């Protein structure tokens, strides 16, 4: 019990530096979501949400798909804001992941209708891209209220998307321990947390953490250091008690990605 209290106290002390650090690297107003206290669930008081899309590509068409998207993505971003577009290197093959920002569900519905009626988008991209794909998946997520969306400290580097499937019960059960686990890594310099998201649609009881590292080797080095940090180990130990499973993907930003 004494060890548990110490772990909780250490995790709590780490939250303040993480919040201060978030302020220094915050995105402009178009991408920034304000903190709303220490509630942990989706920011349902905020209408802004993020659509997380995953496309699986035919192995023989990956290069062609990326080339086509690089040339024609401007037709799509004319309708709504793209936050980032990544090519997955580890954790999946022939896969891209992208995040789109919407101010409301009605805005997204309007965008979808406009895109479907955009002849350039349909003929120059969609008709060519769809045959290159094997599947598409999406989720709607909110930033967790204690987190702001941040840019990487510099262009380049690698991005890691870690997705956690939590046990049923919701943020009221596991929210604070999950926050402590993430902020213990971020505040200690074991990675730069760019955003934490909680699914509203798609796989429920799922949260995602988007991280940035200088390169894959640096990420491996920092991970090893984190494993030897008693404060991080204590915070993670409490969080994993509520965890069913998790996956990780290491990604590189595409040339046209706003976040890179």
Label the predicted regions.
Residues 2-260:
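Short S/T/G/P-rich N-terminal loop/turn motif that feeds into the first structured element of a domain
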